[in-house]
A protein has these predicted regions:
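Acidic, PIN/NYN-like endoribonuclease modules and their adjacent C-terminal/linker elements
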Residues: 1, 104-134
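Short, well-structured N-terminal submotif of metal-dependent ribonuclease cores
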Residues: 1-37, 44-63, 120
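Structural motif
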Residues: 18, 28, 69-70, 126
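Residues at the C-termini of beta-strands that transition into short coil/loop
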Residues: 36-37, 75, 134
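Active-site neighborhoods of divalent-metal-dependent phosphate/nucleic-acid chemistry enzymes
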Residues: 44-47, 56, 68-117
Length: 134
């Protein structure tokens, strides 16, 4: 089983002294992935930075992440999974954020766990394996 790393975990790496490559390389049995959704969220943070030095630092971090992790795209299997998940959550009145629903759908479609500190949202998704970060 592989693992999809949510932007909440990547932001933890950006703000701490913890090394992303060490974390990824320490997961010998499973490959780590970045979703195209999380890539967009990280790049959004770069564009939102008001200060040039903060922007440059964020961009360097994001480019490092993009170089370190294979990017999982939204494919037809994910779209099918997402449509089913969306319908299920809506019927149960347990909707989660749009970005998070796509991440969860990708995990379900590809047999991945998700590493996240946003457990409240993802715990609403039946069958989703979550690696909780504090």
């Amino acid at each position: 089983m592989g693992i999809l790393i949510d932007s909440s975990v990547l932001i933890h790496f950006e703000r701490s002294d913890t090394d992303l490559r060490t974390y990824v390389e320490g997961r010998e049995e499973e490959e780590a992935f970045l979703s195209v959704i999380s890539a967009s969220e990280l790049l959004h943070g770069v564009h939102r930075a008001g200060d040039k030095s903060i922007k440059a630092k964020r961009l360097a971090f994001v480019e490092g992440v993009l170089a370190a992790l294979p990017v999982l795209v939204i494919d037809l299997a994910t779209a099918r999974s997402h449509s089913q998940l969306w319908a299920d959550l809506a019927q149960r009145g347990k909707m989660i954020g749009v970005h998070d629903s796509w991440l969860a759908a990708a995990c379900l479609a590809h047999g991945l766990r998700i590493a996240t500190s946003n457990c409240r949202e993802f715990e609403r998704v039946p069958g989703l394996d979550i690696e909780k970060w504090e």
